[in-house]
């Protein structure tokens, strides 16, 4: 009898507790179906094209669409109000986290967090915090397009155009006479730059400029018996990375490039040190000093061979 009285008393206390009102943002119980009521896959409403991307693979446990039936709200946050039935005079609120400029962008940190909730464990974004792009308030969706089957950032032939939307000087350089084969689709920005953060300068994939260049130009790495100090120090002492009006991406055409260092103590007469109409004028120094990057020949101290 005492036990029953005790249980009754506990039950009464529980019932007497005031209900805690939950007025915070709510998830739409309909999940993605609630979104498809308005958003469909066609030219006018392409939002649900995300269904054809890796983000909507339900069989993948890490996919946003596989989590608690939340679908779109896995990224956009609890947005039941956005999908609610409204009266004609009511204004539809934006999703909790909005990536669309037409409805007003959410703060960069909120948009970043929506992506990093899943991607922070992946190595390529480990250095995002504090990177040049992060400090410039570039968000993931400033570059990536999620509601399309073909994200241009993941397409080697399209990626550069997306980067050029901010890096306009590099677009100009890439159209110069001498350039890396960007327009030809053979290389792209991320072959040299780690856009999510890097230990190297200028978001390079290597720790130094030279290490980055050597990933393709391995024959220039050395070590050489007779090294050329400016080359060993930095490829950019002689070359422009994104494009040049001079052959081989040179900053200045030969022989003038060489003379920027070798002018004062040249071992040649003035006809060679100050080329004019001589037969050496077109290629100048490299007519003889062909191994400008270094030489392993026993007699290659002058980089003649």
Which residues are covered by each model-predicted region?
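N-terminal secretory signal peptides that target proteins for export/translocation
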Residues: 1-2
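Short sequence/structural segments immediately N-terminal
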Residues: 19-305
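Bacterial N-terminal signal peptides
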Residues: 5-16
């Amino acid at each position: 009898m005492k036990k029953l009285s005790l249980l009754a008393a506990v039950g009464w206390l529980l019932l007497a507790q005031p209900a805690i009102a939950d007025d915070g943002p709510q998830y739409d119980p309909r999940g993605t179906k609630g979104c498809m009521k308005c958003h469909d896959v066609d030219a006018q409403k392409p939002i649900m094209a995300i269904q054809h991307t890796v983000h909507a693979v339900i069989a993948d446990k890490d996919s946003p669409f596989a989590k608690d039936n939340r679908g779109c709200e896995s990224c956009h946050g609890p947005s039941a109000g956005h999908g609610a039935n409204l009266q004609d005079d009511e204004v539809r609120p934006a999703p909790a986290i909005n990536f669309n400029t037409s409805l007003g962008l959410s703060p960069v940190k909120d948009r970043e967090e929506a992506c990093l909730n899943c991607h922070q464990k992946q190595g390529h974004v480990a250095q995002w915090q504090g990177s040049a792009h992060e400090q410039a308030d570039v968000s993931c969706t400033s570059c990536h397009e999620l509601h399309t089957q073909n994200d241009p950032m993941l397409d080697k032939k399209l990626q550069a155009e997306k980067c050029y939307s901010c890096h306009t000087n590099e677009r100009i350089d890439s159209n110069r006479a001498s350039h890396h084969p960007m327009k030809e689709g053979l290389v792209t920005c991320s072959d040299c730059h780690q856009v999510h953060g890097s230990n190297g300068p200028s978001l390079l994939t290597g720790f130094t400029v030279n290490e980055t260049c050597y990933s393709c130009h391995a024959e220039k790495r050395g070590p050489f018996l007779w090294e050329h100090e400016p080359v060993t120090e930095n490829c950019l002492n002689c070359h422009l990375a994104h494009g040049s009006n001079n052959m081989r991406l040179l900053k200045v055409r030969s022989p003038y490039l060489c003379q920027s260092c070798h002018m004062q103590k040249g071992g040649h007469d003035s006809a060679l040190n100050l080329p004019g109409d001589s037969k050496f004028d077109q290629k100048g120094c490299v007519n003889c000093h062909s191994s400008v990057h270094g030489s392993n020949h026993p007699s290659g101290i002058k980089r003649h061979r």
